[in-house]
Curated annotation (Swiss-Prot):
The lineage of its organism: Archaea, Methanobacteriati, Methanobacteriota, Stenosarchaea group, Methanomicrobia. GO terms for cellular component: cytoplasm; proteasome regulatory particle, base subcomplex; proteasome-activating nucleotidase complex. The gene is pan. It comes from Methanosarcina acetivorans (strain ATCC 35395 / DSM 2834 / JCM 12185 / C2A). This is Proteasome-activating nucleotidase. Residues 419-421 are annotated as: Docks into pockets in the proteasome alpha-ring to cause gate opening. Consists of three main regions, an N-terminal coiled-coil domain that may assist in substrate recognition, an interdomain involved in PAN hexamerization, and a C-terminal ATPase domain of the AAA type.
Length: 421
């Protein structure tokens, strides 16, 4: 029997009620399947779009990399430039330069170069074909020379140096005061000493004094060992000396400390070898720099040597090293002060008698006294003690004394009258 809800002539006319329910359920299933399929396709579409964006980013990245590599390739294919030096500046953008090969040329200048930088002596890059100035090369320091500048703060002060009060005062007057309070000298009408030579036996504190000066002044401190100025090739040592003083002028106020001065300033002899002649060239360059036509107002020189007897007389004359400071072996009072300084951070027992230690260390240098303090601490560590006792110091004195006696018996330290058979 037909349902009264079905109108005649409708799409459902002729369909039984059961059949209509079954058809509705199948349509709903089909709709759910289509919706699920649609969600899956939307996810796929979103994933594809994400991959597309990633590939586009990768494309941009690789294109940028290609441009970078192409630029580097073009740069590597660029013809090299010739290094030259400006000799003179002429009007109408014309410059006289000397190429690295030696001859001089009158060349043009690029309009993009600042003319203020084109001073005589400036390094420039020249076009290989036209020799026109392409760019001005900034002046650079020799790495070997730049490494001589002491950048780190040196933790050594005058209160850590015992028994050298007079030497400290002379060093302050000759080095510190001219840099810190130059008006004192101007008021009196004198020029301060230009150089100070510290001389004395090894281990007496010459280098320590120089370190204290570096700590107390805000000046640029340039440390040079004399043997570093002795170079293999002709002219290299003289060039280093020039560049050291040039750096000192640029970074003034500055202090140049030359350790082991006797290695380059030994007395000149008539009979010399090729190596000796190169050392003499370096010495002559040092003498020329110390004299100079320009006054070294803010540059002070300190030198140290164990052998003042072998120095060339030319370097000791007034105007070069004006003040000679003898750093002697410490006396009994000075030895006591030095021992107290080196034992300042040590955990000591109450029986330490510094006066007695100063007496039994007769003839020892400051370096020997520091070795005694270290050895005493080592004896205490060996015995697993909590404190360093007097007996540890006495054992250390004996050990250091034996080492010093052994060193004196070595062939290089024997008197000149000693002969070996």
């Amino acid at each position: 029997m037909r349902s009264h809800l079905v109108k005649p002539g409708s799409v459902y006319d002729g369909i039984e009620p059961g059949e209509l329910g079954e058809s509705t359920e199948s349509v709903q299933d089909r709709v759910r399947q289509l919706e699920s399929r649609n969600s899956f396709l939307e996810e796929q579409c979103s994933q594809i779009e994400s991959e597309k964006r990633y590939l586009e980013n990768q494309k941009i990245k690789y294109e940028r990399e290609i441009r970078k590599l192409q630029s580097e390739l073009d740069r590597m294919k660029t013809s090299p430039l010739i290094i030259g030096t400006v000799i003179d500046v002429i009007k109408n953008d014309r410059i006289i330069v000397r190429s690295s090969n030696g001859p001089q040329f009158l060349v043009n200048v690029s309009q993009y170069i600042d003319e203020k930088k084109l001073l005589p002596g400036a390094k420039v890059a020249l076009n290989q074909h036209t020799l026109a100035i392409a760019e001005v090369i900034p002046s650079t320091e020799e790495p070997f020379v730049a490494a001589m500048e002491v950048i780190e703060s040196i933790e050594v002060d005058y209160d850590q140096i015992g028994g050298l009060d007079e030497q400290i005062q002379e060093l302050q007057e000759a080095v510190e005061l001219p840099l810190i309070e130059p008006e004192r000298f101007a008021r009196i009408g004198i020029e301060p000493p230009k150089g100070v030579l510290l001389y004395g036996l090894p281990g007496t504190g010459k280098t320590l004094l120089a370190k204290a000066v570096a700590h107390r002044t805000n000046a640029t401190f340039i440390r040079v060992v004399g043997s570093e100025l002795v170079q293999k090739y002709i002219g290299d040592g003289s060039k280093l000396v020039r560049e050291i003083f040039e750096m000192a002028r640029k970074k003034a106020p500055s202090i140049i400390f030359i350790d082991e001065l006797d290695s380059i300033a030994a007395r000149r002899l008539n009979e010399t070898t090729g190596a000796d002649r190169e050392v003499q060239r370096t010495l002559m360059q040092l003498l020329a720099e110390m004299d100079g036509f320009d006054k070294r107002k803010n540059i002070r020189i300190i030198a140290a040597t164990n052998r003042p007897d072998v120095l060339d007389p030319a370097i000791l004359r007034p105007g070069r090293f004006d003040r000679l400071v003898h750093v002697p072996m410490p006396g009994i009072e000075a030895r006591g002060k030095i021992l107290k300084i080196h034992c300042g951070k040590m955990t000591l027992a109450g029986d330490i008698d510094f006066k007695k230690l100063a007496k039994v260390t007769e003839g020892m240098s400051g370096a020997d006294l520091k070795a005694i303090a270290t050895e005493a601490g080592m004896f205490a560590v060996r015995k697993d003690k909590a404190l360093v006792e007097m007996e540890d110091f006495l054992e250390a004195v004996e050990k250091v004394s034996m080492a010093a006696d052994t060193q004196k018996m070595m062939p290089g330290n024997l008197p000149e009258t000693t002969m070996f058979v």
